[in-house]
């Protein structure tokens, strides 16, 4: 996968290219990231990249000409088929389904805004889609772009150490992930669930699915509203709810004689 970045601070993306899963993907040639700064497309000695908005008001906007020229340079480098995305709080909210959708693109160009944003006409003429990572305001589009890159890169074949990792992540099937455990077997009196030590893969799968359903019900119940549960899932969720109620009953001490 190739990703082009339009940013006034391209050096921020070293966090993506030099470290972790994405850094390994770049090193192994599975992910390629190039960047263009609008400052390199200015024509004045101050390398000005911002301008006042028409109609007044606080703040500045990114200048049209340097931004458009940077986008055009990225498009030229990408060739045909690159989708141009503007990271914006007004865009479609990124979720796992959206990540999976974006991962089907071989080429992406991510435009990172600064100041109060960019000229609406640039959005109309240069941008294919707007995406947001949440209902809050950041100082620029770089962190959302890095979030998008990291999440999308996990779907590139060969990037993750275990091929099933991306499909088993939280939200991959619309549910939160189940709890995970590693050594030691007992930590300050807390034991690993015995089923995980049993070697019974069918029971382990069933336990993990039950915990995934239950954790989603407890923490993000709205996610279940959009899911058509299978007969097995509905049964496991009912079991979890019963077990949870019993645990709460014992915890509250109301079960004492």
Curated annotation (Swiss-Prot):
Its main location: cytoplasm. Keywords: Cytoplasm, Methyltransferase, S-adenosyl-L-methionine, Transferase, tRNA processing. It holds the Pfam family tRNA_m1G_MT. InterPro entries: Alpha/beta_knot_MTases, tRNA_m1G_MeTrfase_C_sf, tRNA_m1G_MeTrfase_TrmD, tRNA_m1G_MTases_N, tRNA_MeTrfase_TRMD/TRM10. It catalyses: guanosine(37) in tRNA + S-adenosyl-L-methionine = N(1)-methylguanosine(37) in tRNA + S-adenosyl-L-homocysteine + H(+). It is an enzyme of class 2 (transferase). S-adenosyl-L-methionine binds at residues 113, 133-138. One of its GO terms (cellular component) is cytosol. Its EC number is 2.1.1.228. The keyword Methyltransferase applies. It is found in: Cytoplasm. GO terms for molecular function: tRNA (guanine(37)-N1)-methyltransferase activity. It comes from the Bacteria. GO terms for biological process: tRNA N1-guanine methylation. Transmembrane segments: none annotated. Belongs to the RNA methyltransferase TrmD family. Specifically methylates guanosine-37 in various tRNAs. Homodimer. This is tRNA (guanine-N(1)-)-methyltransferase. It comes from Cronobacter sakazakii (strain ATCC BAA-894) (Enterobacter sakazakii). The gene is trmD.
